[in-house]
Amino acid sequence: AGITGLSVACELMEQYADASVLVIERGLLPTGASTKNAGFACIGSLSENLHDISLMGENGLVKLVQDRYEGLHILRNRLGDHNIGYEACGGYEIVLKGEDNGFIDKLDDMNALLYPLFNKNIFSLCNEKIAEFGFSASHANKLIHNSEEGQIDTGKMMNSLWMYAQKLGVKIITGAEVTSLDESEQGIIIATQEMNFFAQKVFICTNAFTKSLFPNIELKPGRGQVLVTKPIQHLKVKGTFFFDEGYYYFKNFEDRIIFGGGRNLDFDNESTLHFGSNQKILTQLNTYLKELILPETTFEIDYSWSGIMAFGTNKLPLVEQIS
């Protein structure tokens, strides 16, 4: 019953109003990354997009950005910006001192490549905002703005999506973990620890947890660490921000900072399906808060959490018919 599962259920009911659609959720609330993501409505930073071109070519990158952009608009149109807390605040990529910034020379090329999607140039240098946001000038070298990014309120969005699905007639059962799927001549038997369900068609929208049902699928889990500061008076940071090829990400939420990432510091331990903290990564997040993001501001950490994502052989959605 995360973003993918509920969105699929809503799409089915929108197209087939008389259908009987049931969503089965293993947790009391959606368990994976949907309720634990930090609320970034992003389509890809300049350095990330250039890296993706090396993996999938220019046409592949354009299709990926288009899918992200259109997917966000489907969510916004379906639920309404107010109901998901959407803010078109823009996205920013911080280029750190000492970091190879040769990719900035390709900014115009990237704008030209993506221009047909947006009918405008979406990337621009805005180094003057480094001081405006209060970042450390000894650590932040350059700042790149992406006009088409924003942020959402994750809790508000999931609550709205849940209510919208139920309004359409989607049934949702929580606290029922699916243990197996077995095909029969009459349809598919969905086994849980408590009882079995029967369906003609099943959509598997379990993301990182799909391997428990299909061990051979090419998906790897990736845990993300996130921390939240206590409210900060006169907070200068406004918007969504990324650095180190998107491995670190932060944004303001009201008068707090939500900061996550650092998975690249410990890939092995973060490739797990178990929720929990990683002290090595949390220490680095604290260091970046002190030295880069809030160098002249006293702050305290309020709490932290982890969420589990899934990664395939590339960044494209894994959508296929199993049987």
Where are these regions (language model features)?
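Glycine-rich FAD pyrophosphate-binding loop
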Residues: M13-K36
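N-terminal Rossmann-fold NAD(P) dinucleotide-binding loop
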Residues: G5
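Flavin-binding catalytic cores
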Residues: N111, Q233-L235, S271-S306
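Flavin (FAD/FMN) cofactor-binding and adjacent substrate-gating region
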Residues: S47-I53, N77-M163, L168
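Helical element adjacent to the flavin cofactor pocket in flavoenzyme catalytic cores
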Residues: A137-K201, C205
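Central helical "cap/lid" subdomain
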Residues: I190-V237
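C-terminal catalytic lobe of FAD-dependent flavoproteins
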Residues: K142, E148, I293-S323
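Glycine-rich active-site loop/strand segments that organize a redox cofactor
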Residues: G32, K36-Q66
